[in-house]
């Protein structure tokens, strides 16, 4: 073969491979865009999940604090009521022994 024919054949092969690479670039770009969209959605979903988890934790803490305060209030009320009940019983016992 003549050197010109080899040179032209090599040039045609290079042009054909360059065209093939150009055809792959948009699909590679599309693939990367799809990957980035998926990664963005995953990050957003994770962030939303974490925020919802934090809100749920705050709600649980608020409920626990409320129940704790209610139990403290009930304990105080019960203590005062039982103290009143005990003193009322003593008054009745004392009054009954004085009457005898």
From Swiss-Prot:
Pfam families: Apo-CIII. It is found in: Secreted. The keyword Cell inner membrane does not apply. Glycans are attached at residue 94. GO terms for molecular function: high-density lipoprotein particle receptor binding; lipase inhibitor activity; phospholipid binding. One of its GO terms (cellular component) is very-low-density lipoprotein particle. It comes from the Eukaryota. Residues 1-20 form the signal peptide. PANTHER family: APOLIPOPROTEIN C-III. Belongs to the apolipoprotein C3 family. This is Apolipoprotein C-III. It comes from Neomonachus schauinslandi.
